[in-house]
Amino acid sequence: VSTHNAGGHSSQPRDDNAIYDLAAALTRVRAWQAPVMWNDTTLAQLKKAGELTSGELGAALRKFAADPHDAAAAAVIARSPAYVGTTRTTCVATMLNGGHAQNALPQSAVANVNCRIFPGMKVEEVRQALQGVVGNLAEVKLTGTPMSSDPSPLRPDVVKAVTHAVNAIRPGTPVVPGQVSGASDGLLFRSAGIPTYGVDGNFMKDDEDFSHGLNERLTVQSFYDSLKFWHVLVTDLAGPRR
């Protein structure tokens, strides 16, 4: 999101100011909410989360899972950082850069707005929505080559195979599908029309999770459990040897 101005000397301030315009534009972005969305995976995820969550949020999760048209429930979920991304696309400012000298009126100001796009919503659709929100205050451009895709269907054969594999290493563990506000190589496969699912046989405690750290590692038991998990999962999906 960027703004531009002729600039000038700070001793001669004017009403039009690139930084002020950007601030006003970001205030509008902050207030904007994408339309509520859902799919089979998120409804199953929120139903189970609601059963395990108490209070107002737990009630909202259960209500939304039962009726995703429940606007009041969606509003409560939107206030939860942990779950808002399971009900809609989110956009948030993450970086700012503006001005070129401490004693000069800014000629430009730029903000990076990071969007996590809900499967089924198009990248250009989000850009146009943000441009409509900021109006003439700023210009909204895409950075990089972002992609979007439709969600993969919640296939019963995949759920059955994953459940079997999980219970092979952790008997009695409930298996609940979920959607995360991130991305993986699965995005490329889904965009090509190939149903894709992220699964893992790695179980660990919170204090054993060093993901993306310099000391990223698995416990020894998790390594061997994962080998068994993948063997069961792949052989189930591939079928018997012929």
Question: Could you tell me what each predicted segment is?
Answer:
Residues 11-35:
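A short core secondary-structure module
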Residues 111-113:
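Hydrophobic residues positioned within well-ordered beta-strands of beta-sheet architectures
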Residues 35, 39-103, 107-108, 119, ...:
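An extended, acidic, His-containing surface patch that forms the Zn2+-binding/catalytic region
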Residues 3, 115-117:
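Hydrophobic beta-strand positions in extracellular immunoglobulin-like domains
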Residues 2-9:
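Flexible glycine/proline-enriched surface loops and loop-helix/loop-strand junctions
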